[in-house]
C-alpha cells in the first residue's frame, strides 16, 4: 500500500492514501534525498483524520522531507529484533543497530513494540525479594521480583553507578540478562555508559536501546517500548528473570506530552497529555512476573523542580513497589552507594514477606539512624560531651551503621582500585543485627567503612589494631 506526503509539521506528517488506509500504530516509511544524502524515516500512524488521510508521528528528523514524496505502508507495527543477538549491542527505536558494528543476523526474530500485558491467569502473584547484593538496598528497601523500583536522585549522586552495579550483580549471581532503555537522556551519558560497561565487562549481558534528547518526541516516547519488547522476549520465550532499566521515565511522559500537543489534543493539568495515566499504565502493566519468568524494572525518575505532585512523576508513583532515594549529603560524606536509609521505602518490607527477623533489624536500623538525626542539632551546638550515656551509645552505633551501609562496587574498581563485594541477604541481616545488639561496640567505626559483610569489618579492625 502506497500513499503520498500531504503536509509536514515538524515531527507530524499527514499522508494521503487511495483506497484503504493503514491502521493505528502501523509503521510506514518514506525514503527521500536531503542534501545529497539518502534518508529513510519511519512514521507511525497516530490518527485517521478522514478523506483517506492519516496523521503520523515521525521516528526521526523530517528535515528535507517534501510534500508529494512516496510513502510505503508496511502492514505491521514497528518490529524490533529480539533474542540473544541483541545482547552487547545498541539499537534505536526502530531496532536498527547504531553502535557502528555489523547488522544483526537476518534470521533474528522480530517482535512488534505494541504488545498487550500478560493475561491475569499467566501472571504470578508470588511476592519474592529480588536479592541485589547491595546491603542498603536489600535491608531497607528490598526490590520485588517482577516489581518496579523508582530511583530518585539529582545529577552526580551515583544513579548510573548503581544501575551498572545491578547489571553486574544480576549477571554474576543470577546469570541473568538486562535491558537498558535510554529515554530522552543526554547522548554523552549514553556513550559513557556503553564504554563503562565495556570496561567493567558487563556489556555482553545487556541490550541497549537509545532515544536521546535531540531526537523527535515519537522516538523518545516509543524507545521505552522497544527496550521492553526485548525484555519480554527473554521472559516469555526463554523463561528468564530480566532486569529492565529505564532512564528516565519522566522523559517518556514528557515526549508523550509533546506528541499529544502536536496532534492537536486538548492538554490537561500542567500541559500534559489527557491520556498520561493510560499511556503510563500501558507501559507499566507490561512489566510484571509471569509463571515463566519475570521483568524487574528500575526506573530513574527525574522530578521537575523537585515537585513530587507534578502529574508526570505522580503518574509513576502509582505503579512503584519500592523507591531508592539517593541523597547528596550522604555522597558528600563519602558514603557510596549514597542511598538515603530513612527516605527509601519498599512495599515488601513486611514481616509476612521478608520474615520477622529481617523486618525487625531493618526497623531497628532506621530507628537508630532517626535518633542520631534528631540529636545532630544538639551535637552541633553543645558537642558530644553533653549527651547522656545512652545517647552517646546510640550515636556511636548509628555512625557504625552509616559506615556499614557503604560498600565497594565491582564496577567502581576502575576508580577506587578496591574489589567489589556482593553481600548475601542473610549476612547483611546478621551483620546489622550484631551492631544493634552492641556486640561490636568495641570496634573502631572506620573498620565498618567500605567493607562487605561483618566478618570483613572485624578483620579490618584487627589489622588497624596491629598497625597501631
Curated annotation (Swiss-Prot):
UniProt gene name: atpD
One GO cellular component, as annotated: proton-transporting ATP synthase complex
E.C. numbers: 7.1.2.2
Annotated residues for binding of ATP: 153-160
Matches recorded under CDD domains: ATP-synt_F1_beta_C, ATP-synt_F1_beta_N, F1-ATPase_beta_CD
Name of the protein: ATP synthase subunit beta
Family from the record: Belongs to the ATPase alpha/beta chains family.
Key word Zinc-finger present: no
Chemical reaction(s) catalysed: ATP + H2O + 4 H(+)(in) = ADP + phosphate + 5 H(+)(out)
Parts of the chain that traverse the membrane: none
Keyword Magnesium listed: no
Keyword vocabulary terms for this entry: ATP synthesis, ATP-binding, Cell inner membrane, Cell membrane, CF(1), Hydrogen ion transport, Ion transport, Membrane, Nucleotide-binding, Translocase, Transport
Subunit structure: F-type ATPases have 2 components, CF(1) - the catalytic core - and CF(0) - the membrane proton channel. CF(1) has five subunits: alpha(3), beta(3), gamma(1), delta(1), epsilon(1). CF(0) has three main subunits: a(1), b(2) and c(9-12). The alpha and beta chains form an alternating ring which encloses part of the gamma chain. CF(1) is attached to CF(0) by a central stalk formed by the gamma and epsilon chains, while a peripheral stalk is formed by the delta and b chains.
UniProt-recorded Gene Ontology molecular function terms: ATP binding; ATP hydrolysis activity; proton-transporting ATP synthase activity, rotational mechanism
Amino acid at each position: 500500500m502506497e500513499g503520498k506526503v500531504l503536509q509536514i509539521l515538524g515531527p507530524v506528517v499527514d499522508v494521503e492514501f487511495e483506497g484503504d488506509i493503514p491502521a493505528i500504530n502501523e509503521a510506514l516509511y518514506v525514503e527521500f534525498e536531503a542534501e545529497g544524502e539518502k534518508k529513510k524515516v519511519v512514521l507511525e500512524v497516530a490518527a485517521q483524520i478522514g478523506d483517506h488521510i492519516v496523521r503520523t508521528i515521525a521516528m526521526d528528523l523530517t528535515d528535507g522531507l517534501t510534500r508529494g514524496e512516496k510513502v510505503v505502508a508496511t502492514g505491521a507495527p514497528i518490529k524490533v529484533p529480539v533474542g540473544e543477538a541483541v545482547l552487547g549491542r545498541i539499537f534505536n527505536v526502530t531496532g536498527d543497530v547504531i553502535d557502528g558494528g555489523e547488522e544483526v543476523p537476518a534470521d533474528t526474530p522480530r517482535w512488534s513494540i505494541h504488545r498487550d500485558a500478560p493475561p491475569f491467569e499467566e501472571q504470578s502473584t508470588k511476592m519474592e525479594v529480588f536479592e541485589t547484593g547491595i546491603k542498603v538496598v536489600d535491608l531497607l528497601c528490598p526490590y520485588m521480583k517482577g516489581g518496579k523500583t523508582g530511583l530518585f536522585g539529582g545529577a552526580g549522586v551515583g544513579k548510573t553507578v548503581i544501575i551498572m552495579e545491578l547489571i553486574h550483580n544480576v549477571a554474576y549471581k543470577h546469570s541473568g540478562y538486562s535491558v537498558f532503555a535510554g529515554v530522552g537522556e543526554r547522548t554523552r551519558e549514553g556513550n559513557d555508559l556503553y564504554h563503562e560497561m565495556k570496561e567493567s565487562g558487563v556489556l555482553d549481558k545487556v541490550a541497549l536501546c537509545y532515544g536521546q534528547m535531540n531526537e523527535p518526541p515519537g522516538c523518545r516516547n516509543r524507545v521505552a517500548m522497544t527496550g521492553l519488547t526485548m525484555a519480554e522476549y527473554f521472559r516469555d520465550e526463554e523463561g528468564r528473570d530480566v532486569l529492565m532499566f529505564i532512564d528516565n521515565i519522566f522523559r517518556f511522559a514528557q515526549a508523550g506530552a509533546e506528541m499529544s500537543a502536536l496532534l492537536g489534543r486538548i492538554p490537561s493539568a500542567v500541559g500534559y497529555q489527557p491520556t498520561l495515566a493510560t499511556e503510563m499504565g500501558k507501559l507499566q502493566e507490561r512489566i510484571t512476573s509471569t509463571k515463566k519468568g519475570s521483568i524487574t524494572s528500575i526506573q530513574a525518575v527525574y522530578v521537575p523542580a523537585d515537585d513530587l505532585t507534578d502529574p508526570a512523576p505522580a503518574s509513576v508513583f502509582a505503579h512503584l513497589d519500592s523507591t531508592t532515594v539517593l541523597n547528596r549529603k550522604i555522597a558528600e560524606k563519602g558514603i557510596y552507594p549514597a542511598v538515603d536509609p530513612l527516605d527509601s521505602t519498599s512495599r515488601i518490607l513486611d514481616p509476612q514477606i521478608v520474615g520477622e527477623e529481617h523486618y525487625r533489624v531493618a526497623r531497628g536500623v532506621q530507628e537508630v539512624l532517626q535518633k542520631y538525626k534528631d540529636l545532630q542539632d544538639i551535637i552541633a551546638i553543645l558537642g558530644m560531651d553533653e549527651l547522656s550515656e545512652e545517647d552517646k551509645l546510640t550515636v556511636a552505633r548509628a555512625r557504625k551503621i552509616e559506615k556499614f551501609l557503604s560498600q565497594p562496587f565491582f564496577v567502581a574498581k576502575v576508580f577506587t582500585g578496591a574489589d567489589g563485594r556482593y553481600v548475601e541477604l542473610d549476612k547483611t541481616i546478621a551483620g546489622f543485627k550484631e551492631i544493634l545488639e552492641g556486640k561490636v561496640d568495641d570496634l573502631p567505626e572506620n573498620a565498618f567503612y567500605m567493607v562487605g559483610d561483618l566478618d570483613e569489618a572485624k578483620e579490618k579492625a584487627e589489622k588497624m589494631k596491629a598497625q597501631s
